[in-house]
């Protein structure tokens, strides 16, 4: 699947499912590299990895490249269109060939997963600015609870997105975005 197809899918989902999508385009390669950088300095051995909100897979792609044969990656995506797209990407794009059997796409809400500590690293691409504070708290509590001792959690927030959203948000949304 070429980049422009993924971008079209992403933009369509942004328009139709803004609350859970939150970005106009998929994350770029530089962000994906930064998000998975922890794999380069963590003690190596079999690792269990979790990606929350992988979308069309830019972070998944870099994580797959950094995985060793004993690693596994669960990519948890709530959006069925993104989950289906990511499965196709993993099954058909050559960059995933080496790690294809080690990656599982799970279509569900992260809060529905068991909270036992089992992951060495978690990469999170959720649009936290779209969520209410209690939702953000529940998401972070769940992810931190899923990390093994010494595990790493990588997440990001788009720079200036709060100020860009303010003119379009209702009163309640403006209060939330102002912090």
Task: Go through each PLM region and give its residues.
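S-adenosyl-L-methionine
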Residues: 83-115
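Conserved beta-strand signature within the Rossmann-like core of class I S-adenosyl-L-methionine
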Residues: 150-159
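A short glycine-rich, Lys/Arg-flanked "PGG" loop and its adjoining helix->strand segment in the class I
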Residues: 137-149
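Conserved SAM/SAH-binding beta-strand->alpha-helix loop
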Residues: 79
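A short SAM/SAH-binding and catalytic strip from SAM-dependent methyltransferases
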Residues: 119-135
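Conserved class I S-adenosyl-L-methionine
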Residues: 46-55
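Class I SAM-dependent methyltransferase Rossmann-like catalytic core
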Residues: 5-42
